[in-house]
Amino acid sequence: MTIRNQRFSLLKQPIYSTLNQHLIDYPTPSNLSYWWGFGSLAGICLVIQIVTGVFLAMHYTPHVDLAFNSVEHIMRDVEGGWLLRYMHANGASMFFIVVYLHIFRGLYYASYSSPREFVWCLGVVIFLLMIVTAFIGYVLPWGQMSFWGATVITSLASAIPVVGDTIVTWLWGGFSVDNATLNRFFSLHYLLPFILVGASLLHLAALHQYGSNNPLGVHSEMDKIAFYPYFYVKDLVGWVAFAIFFSIWIFFAPNVLGHPDNYIPANPMSTPPHIVPEWYFLPIYAILRSIPDKAGGVAAIALVFISLLALPFFKEMYVRSSSFRPIYQGIFWLLLADCLLLGWIGCQPVEAPFVTIGQISSFFFFLFFAITPILGRVGRGIPKYYTDETHRTGSVS
């Protein structure tokens, strides 16, 4: 090939060399398990949500008198509209399932520890953006649960001292949830997924700066292989399993993860007997309800994300992986059970004994993050191949 041809070869362009560096030749620890495949699955979910959302937006009308009917129009009159809507609605649930598994894998293997603090913090920001995007998207069908969910959740901002009421009025675009609110939420719901794409790319770039963690939690530059083709083939197994799982919900149980009240048009004069958010918000909603005071509940929700953000900045551990930390391993499984219990409590009425159970579960949730720094230096089974320098500094990288 001549010098001129080399200069104009597409594969020689910077963008392709960057893609090759991050997606093809990226050096990956050879012992990664299937638990490391949820990052790529999250990317697939995000693409599905954006593509289906763009097509749904072509037929949706963001007006309080037309929104509910436009959704029914998509379901009944648009060719393939039912498939688009069910893919989008259930795709949100799949997205959160994948991301929750991704987060718990990070907690189990301490993927948040040095030198990947920035990777973890970006992940928490992405998680927060997902919650905001999903919430405002849930309002758009303008059913009963959409309307009253928007009313209850947005009114929580009034608990902020001094500026709370002003923020609520700004969110509503008036003095109640109405047409201005719906228009604002539709605009933001269209915009935020693209911000999520940018945040995800930053997350990926930050990860590749120091490389992926591994099940042993031991850093090594020697035992690595190229991402392609080995981990593409490995991830392909997860992609196929995910496609089957996703298809079951779309074609056999498309409304199970939703709420039947949302098939009733929004009525400001009739309050549902029990207002509950989507299932993936239930653990956080249970923590919110466990505090009787509104301001205290909002502070507890803020503390959830502060705890996640602060996790990487606790003192370093001798060993990352829970495989060598049996005490932490047991506490981790208790945390997982606690989060499932919070999810169940979140959909129960606000009455005894559910309130008490929610308060105990919320206390243990925060206790986990409080004792994690201590557990980082407690345990047995430190691998013998750790060097003396590792033991002195507490660093595994």
From Swiss-Prot:
Recorded superkingdom: Eukaryota
Annotated membrane topology: Multi-pass membrane protein
MF-aspect GO terms: metal ion binding; ubiquinol-cytochrome-c reductase activity
Cofactor binding summary note: Binds 2 heme b groups non-covalently.
Annotated Pfam families: Cytochrom_B_C (PF00032), Cytochrome_B (PF00033)
InterPro entries attached to this UniProt entry: Cyt_b/b6_C, Cyt_b/b6_C_sf, Cyt_b/b6_N, Cytb/b6-like_sf, Cytochrome_b, Cytochrome_b_C_euk/bac, Cytochrome_b_N_euk/bac, Di-haem_cyt_TM
Chain sites annotated for binding heme b b562: 88, 189
Sequence positions that bind a ubiquinone: 208
Keywords: Electron transport, Heme, Iron, Membrane, Metal-binding, Mitochondrion, Mitochondrion inner membrane, Respiratory chain, Transmembrane, Transmembrane helix, Transport, Ubiquinone
Entry cofactors: heme b
Membrane-crossing segments per the record: 38-58, 82-104, 119-139, 185-205, 231-251, 295-315, 327-347, 354-373
An example Gene Ontology biological process: mitochondrial electron transport, ubiquinol to cytochrome c
GO cellular component, one term: membrane
Compartments where located: Mitochondrion inner membrane
Residues annotated for heme b b566 binding in this entry: 102, 203
Gene3D superfamilies registered for this protein in UniProt: Cytochrome Bc1 Complex, Chain C
Function, as annotated: Component of the ubiquinol-cytochrome c reductase complex (complex III or cytochrome b-c1 complex) that is part of the mitochondrial respiratory chain. The b-c1 complex mediates electron transfer from ubiquinol to cytochrome c. Contributes to the generation of a proton gradient across the mitochondrial membrane that is then used for ATP synthesis.
Miscellaneous comment in the UniProt entry for this protein: Heme 1 (or BL or b562) is low-potential and absorbs at about 562 nm, and heme 2 (or BH or b566) is high-potential and absorbs at about 566 nm.
Subunit annotation: The main subunits of complex b-c1 are: cytochrome b, cytochrome c1 and the Rieske protein.
Similarity field: Belongs to the cytochrome b family.
Name this polypeptide is given: Cytochrome b
Gene of this entry: MT-CYB
